[in-house]
Amino acid sequence: MEAIRIGFGLPNVHSVPLCLTTTRCLFPRQRLLHSHTPSWKPAKQQDFFVASSSKKSSDDLESSLPTPHFSPSLWGDHFLSVSLNRAEFDELEREIETTKPLARDKLMSSESSDKEKIRLIHLLVSMGISYHFDKEIQDILKHSFTKLDDIIVGEDDLETISIMFEVFKLYGHKMSCDAFDRFRGNDGRFKESLVRDFRGMLQLFEVAHLGTPCEVIMDEALSFTRNHLESLTSGNASTASPHLLKHIQNSLYIPRYCNIEVLVAREYISYYEQEEGHDEILLKFAKLNFNFCQFHYVQELKTLTKWWRDLDLASKLPYIRDRLVESHLVALGPYFEPHYSLGRIIVAKINMIMVVVDDTYDAYATLPQVKALTECLQRWSIEVSDKLPDYLRIVLGSLFDVMGEIEREMRPLGRLYRVKQVVEKIKIITKAYQEIAKWARTGHVSTFDEYMKVGVLTAGMADYAAYCFIGMEDINEKEAFEWLNSNPLIIKHLTAMFRLANDVGTYETEINRGEVANGLNCYMKQYGVTKEEASRELRKMYVYRKKVVVEEFMNSHDHVPRQVLLRCLNIARIFDVFYTEGDGYSEPKGKIEHFMTSLYLHPIPLS
């Protein structure tokens, strides 16, 4: 099958060792290791710690911030102790190979109408198994869209129209939202009789999150459905079944397109199993697929945990956020499918090492140190590293080592161009980090617009997309990066989305440690409004930006590969997961912990 073969317990993915030897390297690792810096020699690394109480020079004290104290990792080395049974993995793979043709037969059945096939596609998407039949689905929808008017004529079922609108939009076909006019009365409002159609209301609520700036009816649909669904779940006299009520509550808490795909699938499988008349073959296939994916995730976490433990940065640099497993969850956002396993490992590694760099700029280094570090990074060289204190040499050396390791992995795959592109984007983002650090150390509160010009650069969504592209086999790298480097609208608005969500979510933490360079704070100061008022305004900006992301996703299908666009749409789904209730990445206890537990620790029972 097309899914990757992982040798459990072995440090390899796609049969490529995670550490490949090479005589040539783009990165100055060896020079750094052998430069005249005793504290960086491997034999002494384990003895070095950054102590917040250590004495600092006058330069160190210049514009310094209070040392942050993040909670320790929830996971530690847990995944190193998790045993994976290769026989169970092989059995899962065999069952998937046996069940997949049966599922495909249902999709391709000549006895099914176009409408039935589209509803089936929606089910496959919901349960996380549509990727197995991507070509078949695209062919079906391309054919069906040519006769859409005939398919929907006379259709008065809200759930069916909503499903069709969602599925066509998800695959790049522009179904007009005029199809929803049939559900509005003479006053232009949605008919109150719809509120008794619980499934139709829920489906309309979900698809309303895929609205674009010009689709005003989607805003009306969202308000209409949310109000009635909230009333439904808060009442005691509901006629909806308990499992449907729970499903509605989950959707109100975090709607489908504000959630990571695999988390949606995990919840939907449990819901679908309780539906009367569910398809046993498709349900079994979805369960097998989830457990198969989970095997991959745990193996990836075993590999990552060993890598992170060997780096030992959590003890050497105790001011950083030790969030390796959370970084893997972030990497699941763009792609959850098994064949992107190598990509997730790469994304998680770069994300984690950039968290180290970000925390150093944000919360620990003094302004002179920030400037010296930035100079080294802009040159991508250690020539000026003598200006750095020992702990910054560890930060710099670790970044060079990680990128050098990835370069060695990518060389035999012919993907060095992708790694070079990521390096250039790291230079851009760290230069912006310096500007924000300067504002923070000097107490400068800029205007909101001035802040956003720099803040969007630190958001790094172009960087994140580039990380994702490294591990993808199904793209043309030159075309993908030419498009990415053209600064397309979808990336601009993704970047703004992250900046807005992050600044609202991290406001309390950042202000408490003296970081005034925060978008929410800048807005409050500029307009003289309360935190609550500023939060509402930034949320409006966020919602608008997301609509543009959806619009650009739709408008770009004729010149940008679907696999590239999907990464962007999926990245947009990450932000609400982590930032709707504070800073879920930095403080994952609670919701994020629950999500990680459901994905990594609990397989779905097959019977």
Curated annotation (Swiss-Prot):
Keywords in alphabetical order: Cytoplasm, Lyase, Magnesium, Manganese, Metal-binding
Tissue note: Predominantly expressed in flowers but also in siliques, roots, leaves and stems.
Residues annotated to bind Mg(2+) 1: D358, D362
Positions annotated to bind Mg(2+) 3: N502, T506, E510
UniProt motif (DDXXD motif) ranges: 358-362
One of the record's GO molecular function terms: terpene synthase activity
GO BP, one annotated term: diterpenoid biosynthetic process
Disulfide bond is among the record's keywords: no
Subcellular locations according to the entry: Cytoplasm
Cofactor remark: Binds 3 Mg(2+) or Mn(2+) ions per subunit.
Residues that, per the record, bind Mg(2+) 2: D358, D362
Listed pathway(s): Secondary metabolite biosynthesis; terpenoid biosynthesis
Presence of keyword Transmembrane: no
GO annotation, cellular component aspect: cytoplasm
Cofactor or coenzyme needed: Mg(2+); Mn(2+)
EC number assigned by the record: 4.2.3.-
Family note: Belongs to the terpene synthase family. Tpsa subfamily.
Domain characteristics, as noted in the entry: The Asp-Asp-Xaa-Xaa-Asp/Glu (DDXXD/E) motif is important for the catalytic activity, presumably through binding to Mg(2+).
Name listed for the protein in its UniProt record: Terpenoid synthase 29
Gene: TPS29
